[in-house]
A protein has these predicted regions:
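Structured, contiguous alpha/beta core segments that scaffold functional sites
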Residues: 1-174
Protein backbone atom coordinates (compact mmCIF):
# COMPACT_ATOMS: atom_id res chain seq x y z
CA UNK A 1 0.00 0.00 0.00
CA UNK A 2 1.05 3.51 0.83
CA UNK A 3 4.04 2.37 2.90
CA UNK A 4 5.61 0.74 -0.17
CA UNK A 5 4.97 3.90 -2.20
CA UNK A 6 6.73 6.05 0.40
CA UNK A 7 9.73 3.69 0.54
CA UNK A 8 9.99 3.59 -3.27
CA UNK A 9 9.52 7.35 -3.49
CA UNK A 10 12.53 7.91 -1.26
CA UNK A 11 14.56 5.44 -3.33
CA UNK A 12 13.52 6.90 -6.70
CA UNK A 13 13.73 10.62 -5.91
CA UNK A 14 17.04 11.39 -4.19
CA UNK A 15 16.04 14.94 -3.27
CA UNK A 16 13.09 13.60 -1.20
CA UNK A 17 15.36 11.16 0.64
CA UNK A 18 17.95 13.88 1.23
CA UNK A 19 15.29 16.26 2.56
CA UNK A 20 14.08 13.75 5.16
CA UNK A 21 17.64 12.93 6.22
CA UNK A 22 18.36 16.66 6.53
CA UNK A 23 15.27 17.15 8.73
CA UNK A 24 16.42 14.31 10.97
CA UNK A 25 19.89 15.85 11.28
CA UNK A 26 18.48 19.33 11.94
CA UNK A 27 16.54 18.03 14.92
CA UNK A 28 19.88 17.57 16.63
CA UNK A 29 20.27 15.97 20.00
CA UNK A 30 19.47 16.75 23.58
CA UNK A 31 21.18 17.09 26.93
CA UNK A 32 20.35 15.38 30.20
CA UNK A 33 20.67 16.82 33.67
CA UNK A 34 20.31 14.74 36.81
CA UNK A 35 22.24 13.57 39.88
CA UNK A 36 23.87 10.65 38.05
CA UNK A 37 24.46 12.74 34.95
CA UNK A 38 27.81 11.20 33.97
CA UNK A 39 26.49 7.61 34.20
CA UNK A 40 23.36 8.53 32.27
CA UNK A 41 25.37 10.25 29.54
CA UNK A 42 27.58 7.17 29.21
CA UNK A 43 24.50 4.95 28.97
CA UNK A 44 22.89 7.19 26.33
CA UNK A 45 26.13 7.19 24.33
CA UNK A 46 26.65 3.41 24.45
CA UNK A 47 23.18 1.85 24.68
CA UNK A 48 22.67 -0.76 21.94
CA UNK A 49 19.84 0.22 19.63
CA UNK A 50 19.80 -2.50 17.00
CA UNK A 51 21.35 -3.28 13.65
CA UNK A 52 24.89 -2.69 14.93
CA UNK A 53 24.10 0.83 16.11
CA UNK A 54 24.86 2.31 19.51
CA UNK A 55 23.71 5.42 21.31
CA UNK A 56 20.37 7.06 21.81
CA UNK A 57 21.09 9.46 18.93
CA UNK A 58 21.16 6.54 16.46
CA UNK A 59 17.86 5.27 17.88
CA UNK A 60 16.20 8.68 17.73
CA UNK A 61 17.41 9.28 14.16
CA UNK A 62 15.92 6.00 12.91
CA UNK A 63 12.73 6.56 14.94
CA UNK A 64 12.26 10.08 13.55
CA UNK A 65 13.06 8.89 10.01
CA UNK A 66 10.24 6.34 10.28
CA UNK A 67 7.90 8.91 11.82
CA UNK A 68 8.43 11.36 8.95
CA UNK A 69 8.32 8.71 6.22
CA UNK A 70 5.37 6.60 7.38
CA UNK A 71 3.59 8.89 9.85
CA UNK A 72 4.32 6.49 12.68
CA UNK A 73 7.27 4.87 14.40
CA UNK A 74 7.79 1.92 16.72
CA UNK A 75 10.49 1.07 19.21
CA UNK A 76 11.12 -1.41 21.98
CA UNK A 77 12.71 -1.11 25.39
CA UNK A 78 14.74 -4.27 26.04
CA UNK A 79 14.86 -5.07 29.74
CA UNK A 80 16.92 -7.84 31.34
CA UNK A 81 17.56 -8.33 35.02
CA UNK A 82 15.29 -5.38 35.81
CA UNK A 83 17.62 -3.05 33.91
CA UNK A 84 17.20 -1.32 30.57
CA UNK A 85 19.71 -3.04 28.27
CA UNK A 86 18.80 -1.72 24.82
CA UNK A 87 16.45 0.55 22.92
CA UNK A 88 15.61 -0.80 19.47
CA UNK A 89 13.56 0.59 16.61
CA UNK A 90 11.37 -1.64 14.51
CA UNK A 91 9.78 -1.91 11.10
CA UNK A 92 6.50 -0.12 11.60
CA UNK A 93 5.27 -1.32 8.19
CA UNK A 94 5.18 -4.92 9.47
CA UNK A 95 2.85 -4.06 12.36
CA UNK A 96 -0.85 -3.52 12.76
CA UNK A 97 -2.34 -1.14 15.29
CA UNK A 98 -5.63 -2.26 16.76
CA UNK A 99 -7.99 -0.61 19.18
CA UNK A 100 -7.69 -1.97 22.71
CA UNK A 101 -10.31 -2.37 25.43
CA UNK A 102 -11.54 1.18 24.82
CA UNK A 103 -11.02 3.98 22.31
CA UNK A 104 -8.03 5.33 24.26
CA UNK A 105 -6.16 2.01 24.30
CA UNK A 106 -4.34 0.54 21.36
CA UNK A 107 -2.42 -2.65 20.83
CA UNK A 108 0.44 -3.49 18.49
CA UNK A 109 0.18 -6.72 16.54
CA UNK A 110 2.97 -8.35 14.56
CA UNK A 111 3.50 -11.41 12.38
CA UNK A 112 4.75 -14.73 13.72
CA UNK A 113 7.02 -17.13 11.80
CA UNK A 114 4.09 -18.19 9.59
CA UNK A 115 2.96 -14.62 8.88
CA UNK A 116 -0.09 -14.79 11.17
CA UNK A 117 -0.75 -11.59 13.12
CA UNK A 118 -0.73 -11.84 16.93
CA UNK A 119 -0.82 -9.33 19.76
CA UNK A 120 2.78 -8.53 20.67
CA UNK A 121 3.79 -9.38 24.24
CA UNK A 122 5.02 -6.79 26.73
CA UNK A 123 3.00 -3.92 25.26
CA UNK A 124 4.23 -1.66 28.08
CA UNK A 125 7.78 -1.93 26.70
CA UNK A 126 6.79 -0.88 23.17
CA UNK A 127 7.02 2.71 21.99
CA UNK A 128 4.57 3.92 19.36
CA UNK A 129 4.28 7.46 18.05
CA UNK A 130 2.03 8.96 15.40
CA UNK A 131 2.55 12.09 13.32
CA UNK A 132 -0.46 14.37 12.84
CA UNK A 133 -3.20 11.80 13.47
CA UNK A 134 -6.54 12.58 11.83
CA UNK A 135 -10.02 11.07 12.31
CA UNK A 136 -9.66 8.99 9.14
CA UNK A 137 -5.96 8.27 9.81
CA UNK A 138 -5.79 7.83 13.61
CA UNK A 139 -2.40 6.12 13.43
CA UNK A 140 -0.51 8.94 11.75
CA UNK A 141 -0.03 10.65 8.43
CA UNK A 142 3.20 10.52 6.44
CA UNK A 143 4.95 13.75 5.63
CA UNK A 144 5.07 12.38 2.07
CA UNK A 145 1.30 11.94 1.75
CA UNK A 146 0.99 14.36 -1.20
CA UNK A 147 4.23 13.27 -2.83
CA UNK A 148 3.14 10.35 -5.08
CA UNK A 149 1.54 12.84 -7.49
CA UNK A 150 4.64 15.05 -7.47
CA UNK A 151 6.93 12.03 -7.71
CA UNK A 152 5.09 10.84 -10.81
CA UNK A 153 5.77 14.20 -12.46
CA UNK A 154 9.43 14.17 -11.36
CA UNK A 155 9.94 10.63 -12.64
CA UNK A 156 8.53 11.65 -16.03
CA UNK A 157 10.90 14.62 -16.11
CA UNK A 158 13.88 12.42 -15.15
CA UNK A 159 12.88 9.88 -17.81
CA UNK A 160 12.57 12.60 -20.46
CA UNK A 161 15.99 14.01 -19.53
CA UNK A 162 17.44 10.49 -19.85
CA UNK A 163 15.85 9.94 -23.26
CA UNK A 164 17.05 13.33 -24.50
CA UNK A 165 20.56 12.62 -23.21
CA UNK A 166 20.64 9.29 -25.07
CA UNK A 167 19.47 11.00 -28.26
CA UNK A 168 22.04 13.80 -28.04
CA UNK A 169 24.14 13.71 -31.18
CA UNK A 170 21.97 11.06 -32.83
CA UNK A 171 21.14 12.33 -36.33
CA UNK A 172 17.94 10.27 -36.55
CA UNK A 173 16.51 11.97 -33.44
CA UNK A 174 17.34 15.49 -34.58
Amino acid sequence: GEDRIYRELRAAVPVVDAAILKLVRLCGGFQVRCRGEERLREFLRTVPCGRGQYGIDAFLSAYLDSLLTYGRAVGELVVAGERLRAVCWGDVTALEVREGANALDMELWGPDDRGQMHRLPWQELLLFTTLNPEPEHPYGVSMLRGMPFLADILLKIYNTIGVNWERAGNVRSS
